[in-house]
Structures are given as structure tokens and as C-alpha cells.
Amino acid sequence: MGSVLSTDSGKSAPASATARALERRRDPELPVTSFDCAVCLEVLHQPVRTRCGHVFCRSCIATSLKNNKWTCPYCRAYLPSEGVPATDVAKRMKSEYKNCAECDTLVCLSEMRAHIRTCQKYIDKYGPLQELEETAARCVCPFCQRELYEDSLLDHCITHHRSERRPVFCPLCRLIPDENPSSFSGSLIRHLQVSHTLFYDDFIDFNIIEEALIRRVLDRSLLEYVNHSNTT
């Protein structure tokens, strides 16, 4: 997949990742497997696949998207969300084995992160493994009760619940202080596009935006009329 460090935000990768990146660049023949994350340069942990097809650690891509204005840290393609779990990769990792680069112990790839956290040779060389901070808030899909990152909810609903018509409460409204989630009971996808969208240009129907604006203008006019009537 390549080893690409994200520096647009001015925030550096963990020290251990930086050290390994410099070492790999000095040795161009060192192979980088498809199980390496291009952000932290370690074996994948909870792999997710982005819309552009690249696979990263879940916490790495979530943090990278927040810091780099929603672009893929590998190919710079626009991404509306962190992607979906790469279950095929996770399954393969459970049956693949690799020698630890530092102590040469044969380790299952799905357990490699746990191994290097305690590998003394790794710690002596790079310091303790540092995971990128995971800052995205989490919510629960009201249709299937799956726990998601808030930025993945729209993608998830479009993919799995496009035909749903039953009224539900918006889980993102519950995350906003002083917001009343009981005030919403319409199409969740439309509501997310209109009320909770910052970078979902590919999914936006501008007719929906126009409807929402007209509705807001009418609501404001009605409120002004009621207030005026009460004062006269």
C-alpha cells in the first residue's frame, strides 16, 4: 500500500512510526505488505476500507480525515467518511503469520499489535507503540442498532437502509447540546444530508436543500406573525 505520512495538518505521526518510516526510506528494497497501514506504518488494527479502496487502521483513518479535510492520506481522493470494516482483510490476517521484524518471533498478523506492545526489542528501538488519538464521536444506528462513528452514519444508512421509511429519532441530534431529538421523525437520510452534512457533496440533492430552506423561512414567518399578534 505504501508508506505515506500525513503532514498537511502540521501534526506529526507517532515517534515510533517516524523512525520506522525513515528506516524504510533508506532501504528501498524492503517490501511493504498489504497488511501495513499507510498512516502509522504498523500492521493493520481494526482495518477499514475507504471508498477509494485503500485500507487503514480504523483509528488512523478517523484521525487523519479530521486533520486533513476529508482526503485519503494515501491518494488524496475526497472521502465522505472513514469507510466500512474491511472484513475480508481482517479474516485473512487471522490466518497469516509473519516474523516480528525486531525479535523474529512468528506471530499471527491479527495479534501483531498486541505482540509489539510487549516486544522488548521493539520498545528499546522505537519506544512504546503509540496509537493515533481517536477523536470521532460514536452513535448508534436507529435502524439496526450498530455502533458507528458519527461521520459514518450517512454512508451506512445509504448503503444498508436506503429503503427504510419508518420514523426514527436522529442519533446525531442527541450529541448536540440543547438539541431536541424528538423533534425529528422523517426520512433519516434526508435529515442527515440537510442538517448534519459538511462534506457530503456527492450525496446532496439540492432540491432537498431548497425544500428545507423554504420550510425554515415559512416557520420563521409564522413565528414572527405569532409574536406580533401577541404584542398587539
From Swiss-Prot:
Reported impact of C75A: Abolishes ability to regulate T-cell activation and E3 ligase activity in vitro
Known disease link: Tenorio syndrome: A disease characterized by overgrowth, macrocephaly, and intellectual disability. Some patients may have mild hydrocephaly, hypoglycemia, and inflammatory diseases resembling Sjogren syndrome.
Region (Disordered): 1-23
Entry EC number(s): 2.3.2.27
N-myristoyl glycine lipid modification positions: G2
Any one GO cellular component localisation term in the record: intracellular membrane-bounded organelle
SMART domains: RING
Alphabetically ordered keywords of this record: Adaptive immunity, Disease variant, Golgi apparatus, Immunity, Intellectual disability, Lipoprotein, Membrane, Metal-binding, Myristate, Transferase, Ubl conjugation, Ubl conjugation pathway, Zinc, Zinc-finger
Zinc finger map (C2HC RNF-type): 100-119
Domain characteristics, as noted in the entry: The C2HC RNF-type zinc finger and the linker region stabilize the RING-type zinc finger, leading to promote binding of the RING-type zinc finger to the ubiquitin-conjugating enzyme E2 (donor ubiquitin).
Region (Interaction with the C2HC RNF-type zinc finger): 43-45
ZnF bounds (RING-type): 37-76
Annotated residues for binding of Zn(2+) 3: C100, C103, H115, C119
Lipid bilayer topology: Lipid-anchor
Organism: Homo sapiens (Human)
UniProt keyword Acyltransferase present: no
Protein name: E3 ubiquitin-protein ligase RNF125
